[in-house]
């Protein structure tokens, strides 16, 4: 990810950097969309009304505001790579914890996971965008649209998987397992 020596990178290193950035966007899209496909189940398991569920979903925005206010300072101090590699596992574990809370009818715990998810996802998203901007500068090419398309690919994958999981009545935890495994592989994908 970003470092003072980006201009001395080889072509294979630049390509790996680009693939890593796209992979992160794909996994962000998957992690964010996976639970959205199962909101009717979430609503039923938590025993909340539609308006109460709407209020729960606001928690993501509240968490995001906190993360977005910190991430600039953190990136300036430690760079993008550290925050992506540290925060992504937190995001991944938070997603699975949210499913466990839903399956155990623990509404307050689920709200907490949504606050944390917003906080962490906002930080990873900004760090990955800053990293993508550095890649564009290093290559003198416009690459960000392709990187952001990765997020859309991730949402499509997760939406399809979520719909299939719902049709075959997979639990939330089992539905999230392949996504979590893909996200936990992230440190092995993020390299130059």
Map each language-model feature to its residues:
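Cytoplasmic helix-loop-helix junction between adjacent transmembrane helices
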Residues: 113-150
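Pair of pore-lining "gating" transmembrane helices in MFS-fold secondary transporters
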Residues: 10-44, 115-116
């Amino acid at each position: 990810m970003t470092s003072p020596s980006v201009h001395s990178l080889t072509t294979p290193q630049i390509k790996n950097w680009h693939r890593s950035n796209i992979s992160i966007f794909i996994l962000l899209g998957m992690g964010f969309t996976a639970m959205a496909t199962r909101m009717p189940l979430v609503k039923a398991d938590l025993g909340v009304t539609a308006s109460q569920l709407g209020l729960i979903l606001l928690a993501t925005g509240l968490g995001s505001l906190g993360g977005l206010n910190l991430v600039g300072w953190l990136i300036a101090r430690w760079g993008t790579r550290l925050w992506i590699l540290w925060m992504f596992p937190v995001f991944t574990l938070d997603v699975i914890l949210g499913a466990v809370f839903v399956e155990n009818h623990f509404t307050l715990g689920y709200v907490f996971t949504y606050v944390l998810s917003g906080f962490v996802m906002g930080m990873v998203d900004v760090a990955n965008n800053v990293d993508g901007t550095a890649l564009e500068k290093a290559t003198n090419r416009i690459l960000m649209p392709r990187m952001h398309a990765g997020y859309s690919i991730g949402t499509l994958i997760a939406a399809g998987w979520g719909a299939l999981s719902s049709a075959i009545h997979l639990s939330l935890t089992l539905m999230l397992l392949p996504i979590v495994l893909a996200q936990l592989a992230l440190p092995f994908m993020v390299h130059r």
